[in-house]
A protein has these predicted regions:
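Accessory "access/gating" subregions that flank catalytic or transport cores
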Residues: 1-25
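Glycine-rich phosphate/ribose-binding loops and adjacent secondary-structure elements
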Residues: 53-67, 74-77
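Functionally critical mobile loop/hinge segments
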Residues: 1, 88-148
């Protein structure tokens, strides 16, 4: 669902997309995976809204520190938010959400933005990594990111 929405957006089809941090790509990528998981898991509308809200807040917070333009692909920033939102829907804690975001950062570091084009849409199957990161975190699998 997320990849189809991104493909349609980047192909220029006339469908609306929620924008966040000045980008429709970020809006789609931080909301659709959480909504999809929430519906799949049978969560209530309120639970899904809370998951999307957390995802959006984390995406905004993360993107704030990169400036308006960044060489990192949208899925890098919005995927971290989506992972945390999915963890919330799974009943996870802040510790597990943090671990899921670390997994996403490690998984997608180096994915470079090449502009909003069809080539950009090829990167967005990586939103599945948000789900996998949430699953790893919920199983207690985490690692520390060590700064140099």
């Amino acid at each position: 669902l997320t990849c189809s929405a991104m493909d349609a957006r980047l192909a220029g089809l006339p469908f609306p997309a929620m924008s966040i941090v000045g980008s429709g790509s970020h809006g789609i990528l931080c909301s659709m995976p959480v909504v999809s998981y929430g519906r799949f898991a049978g969560k209530t509308e309120e639970e899904i809204i809370r998951g999307v809200a957390l995802s959006c807040l984390i995406t905004i917070f993360s993107k704030h520190y990169t400036g308006r333009l960044s060489a990192s692909a949208a899925v890098f920033w919005a995927g971290r938010g989506a992972a945390a939102g999915i963890v919330l829907l799974m009943g996870g804690s802040a510790k597990e959400a943090s671990a899921a975001m670390d997994h996403m950062a490690a998984n997608l570091t180096g994915m470079i933005c090449d502009g909003g084009s069809i080539g950009c849409a090829l990167k967005h199957p990586q939103v599945y990594a948000a789900y996998l990161s949430a699953m790893l975190a919920m199983e207690g699998i985490a690692f520390r990111i060590i700064s140099a």
